[in-house]
C-alpha cells in the first residue's frame, strides 16, 4: 500500500546548509561590481496541511561577502590640518579593492505549495545584521597638497606623502541598518529515506533559492578623516577619501554607489524528519493503491 503525502497533515523539522553567489544591486559610478560568495546554515519547521498547502518558519545564519573595485581613480577634497590651516588635497589611485564580510541572522516565514516530492516556497524574511567587517586595499596612490592661505603648493613632503607612490590597507567594522526585509523564494525536491518504518518519516531535501533584499543598505557614516601613520615619523597622513568606504563615498557630490540591496542565488541541502506518525484514520481516508 502506498500513501499519498497530501492525505494527511505532516510536521517537518529540517536542518542543513546552503550557499551560492551574492551581488550588490546598486547603481555605481567609477566602481566595478564583483560577484562574491555567501553561505550558511538553516533550521526550519514546516506544517503541511492536507492536500497542497503549508507554512514554514525558521532560523538562518548567513555570511555574505561583497566586493567592489576601482581602477585609475582620481579625486580631490579640502581638510583642516593640525594647525587649523586649510589643505586642498588631490590624489590618484592606480587600483583599489574593497571587501565587505557581513554576518547576519534571519527569520523567514514562507507559504508552502507542494505536490508529492516538489515544493515551492515564497515569503518574507527578517534579517538582523550582526557584524560587518570592511577591508580596503589601495595600490600605487599619489598625493599633491596645496595651502590656499599661503598660495603654497607642496611638491615634496615625506610626512604628507606628497609626490610619493605608496600602497596601504585599512580595516574596520561598519554599522548597517539594524533590520532588513528580504523576499525569500525556494524550490525543492524531497527524497524519501524512511517511510514510517520507525514511527517517523525522513527525507533528504535539495533545492535552489533566490533571495532579494527589499531594504536599501548603506553603511553608517564613519569618521570624516582618518590618519595613516607612517612607520618612521610621528606625523599622520590625512586621507579622507581613501579611508572612506566606497558605499559611503562621494565624488563631486555624487555617490559612487547608490543605496541598494543584496540578492542571493544558491543551492541548499537538508535532512528533514516528520516526527509524528499520522493517526490511524489517515490510513483509511488517504488515496492509496495496492493491497
Residue ranges and their predicted role:
Residues 1-9, 184:
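Hydrophobic h-region of N-terminal signal peptides that target proteins for export
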Residues 8-12, 48-55, 192-206, 276-290:
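Short loop/turn motifs that connect adjacent beta-strands in outer-membrane beta-barrel proteins
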Residues 8-48, 270-276, 289-291:
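Short glycine/proline- and aromatic-enriched beta-strand/turn motifs that initiate or cap beta-hairpins
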Residues 11-17, 53-59, 105-107, 118-128, ...:
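Transmembrane beta-strands of outer-membrane beta-barrel proteins
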Residues 19-25, 61-65, 115, 126-132, ...:
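Transmembrane beta-strands of outer-membrane beta-barrel pores
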Residues 25, 43-51, 113-117, 187-197, ...:
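Outer-membrane beta-barrel proteins
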Residues 25-34, 64-102, 129-180, 216-264:
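Extracellular/periplasm-exposed beta-strand and loop segments of Gram-negative cell-envelope proteins
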Residues 164-165, 173-195, 201-205, 209-218:
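Extended serine/threonine-enriched, polar tracts that run as long, contiguous segments within proteins
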Amino acid at each position: 500500500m502506498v500513501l499519498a503525502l497530501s492525505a494527511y497533515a505532516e510536521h517537518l523539522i529540517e536542518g542543513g546548509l546552503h550557499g551560492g553567489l551574492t551581488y550588490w544591486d546598486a547603481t555605481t559610478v567609477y566602481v566595478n561590481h564583483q560577484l562574491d560568495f555567501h553561505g550558511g546554515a538553516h533550521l526550519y519547521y514546516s506544517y503541511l496541511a492536507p492536500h497542497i498547502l503549508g507554512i514554514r518558519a525558521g532560523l538562518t545564519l548567513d555570511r555574505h561577502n561583497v566586493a567592489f573595485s576601482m581602477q585609475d581613480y582620481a579625486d580631490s577634497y579640502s581638510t583642516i590640518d593640525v594647525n587649523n590651516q586649510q589643505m586642498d588635497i588631490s590624489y590618484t589611485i592606480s587600483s583599489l579593492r574593497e571587501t565587505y564580510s557581513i554576518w547576519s541572522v534571519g527569520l523567514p516565514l514562507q507559504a508552502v505549495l507542494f505536490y508529492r516530492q516538489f515544493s515551492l516556497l515564497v515569503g518574507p524574511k527578517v534579517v538582523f545584521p550582526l557584524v560587518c567587517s570592511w577591508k580596503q586595499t589601495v595600490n600605487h596612490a599619489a598625493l599633491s597638497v596645496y595651502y590656499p592661505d599661503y598660495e603654497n603648493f607642496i611638491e615634496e613632503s615625506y610626512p604628507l606623502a606628497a609626490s610619493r607612490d605608496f600602497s596601504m590597507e585599512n580595516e574596520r567594522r561598519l554599522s548597517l541598518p539594524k533590520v532588513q526585509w528580504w523576499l525569500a523564494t525556494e524550490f525543492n525536491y524531497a527524497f524519501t529515506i524512511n517511510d514510517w518504518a520507525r514511527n517517523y518519516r525522513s527525507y533528504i531535501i535539495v533545492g535552489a533559492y533566490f533571495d532579494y533584499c527589499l531594504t536599501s543598505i548603506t553603511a553608517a557614516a564613519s569618521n570624516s578623516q582618518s590618519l595613516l601613520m607612517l612607520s618612521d615619523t610621528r606625523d599622520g597622513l590625512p586621507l579622507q577619501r581613501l579611508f572612506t568606504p566606497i558605499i559611503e563615498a562621494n565624488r563631486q557630490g555624487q555617490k559612487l554607489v547608490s543605496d541598494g540591496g543584496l540578492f542571493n542565488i544558491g543551492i541548499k541541502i537538508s535532512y528533514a524528519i516528520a516526527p509524528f506518525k499520522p493517526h490511524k484514520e489517515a490510513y483509511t481516508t488517504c488515496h492509496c493503491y495496492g493491497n
